[in-house]
Amino acid sequence: MFLTRSEYDRGVNTFSPEGRLFQVEYAIEGHKLGSTAIGIQTSEGVCLAVEKRITSPLMEPSSIEKIVEIDAHIGCAMSGLIADAKTLIDKARVETQNHWFTYNETMTVESVTQAVSNLALQFGEEDADPGAMSRPFGVALLFGGVDEKGPQLFHMDPSGTFVQCDARAIGSASEGAQSSLQEVYHKSTTLKEAIKSSLIILKQVMEEKLNATNIELATVQPGQNFHMFTKEELEEVIKDI
């Protein structure tokens, strides 16, 4: 006799008769409550743009980090439970440094994503990695960087599944943003056009008026390190949209 749905809910490693892991599905839905993030890959580099939700005028906007540097050639944008993201970010940073010390070369964007994916898959295991949790991570990540294959963009969801993308949106307005990306993206898109498109789409889906304090923007280009836009640089870019 099959258990009820609520009883399948309690076990993170138990499949339902329909072949579903409800806790993983809930985590995937949970990350959609986070702020919207957009990543676009071009031949000139990768851009990451994220909405920052300032819930109180007493909050310091600069203390909210939605885009972080993994290594000099890789950045990461997040949406969902930021505390969960910190664990995955730490894992990615440790992996890139260990790879450098061991092989004297930078780690590829795909390998970094794979390492983080392996940790995300270890939920509920007794002998798992020390960073693993007893439940799925409630966060989706966009890894953007440049390696020997050129500019790369990877999306990883809470199930640990990752896939390479030309352009991707995650977060609360991801469906509308993804539709807009499909309309504006083409293989010949320049980095400047990608930056402009990502901000225009964020402007369309954000509830508040877009300004230099409620978004974050970063780029990674061949031959150049990860670059996070300053408030002054953001104001210049926003003037053009």
Curated annotation (Swiss-Prot):
Q: Name one GO biological process term.
A: proteasome-mediated ubiquitin-dependent protein catabolic process
Does the record carry GTP-binding as a key word?
Answer: no
Top-rank taxon, per record: Eukaryota
Pfam families in UniProt: Proteasome, Proteasome_A_N
InterPro entries hit by this protein: Ntn_hydrolases_N, Proteasome_alpha, Proteasome_alpha-type, Proteasome_alpha_type_5, Proteasome_asu_N, Proteasome_sua/b
Indicate yes or no for the key word Iron: no
- Keywords, sorted A to Z: Acetylation, Cytoplasm, Glycoprotein, Nucleus, Phosphoprotein, Proteasome
Q: How does it assemble?
A: The 26S proteasome consists of a 20S proteasome core and two 19S regulatory subunits. The 20S proteasome core is a barrel-shaped complex made of 28 subunits that are arranged in four stacked rings. The two outer rings are each formed by seven alpha subunits, and the two inner rings are formed by seven beta subunits. The proteolytic activity is exerted by three beta-subunits PSMB5, PSMB6 and PSMB7. PSMA5 interacts directly with the PSMG1-PSMG2 heterodimer which promotes 20S proteasome assembly.
The entry assigns this protein to a family as follows: Belongs to the peptidase T1A family.
What role does this protein play? Component of the 20S core proteasome complex involved in the proteolytic degradation of most intracellular proteins. This complex plays numerous essential roles within the cell by associating with different regulatory particles. Associated with two 19S regulatory particles, forms the 26S proteasome and thus participates in the ATP-dependent degradation of ubiquitinated proteins.
Protein name, entry field: Proteasome subunit alpha type-5
- Can you name the source organism? Rattus norvegicus (Rat)
Taxonomic lineage: Eukaryota, Metazoa, Chordata, Craniata, Vertebrata
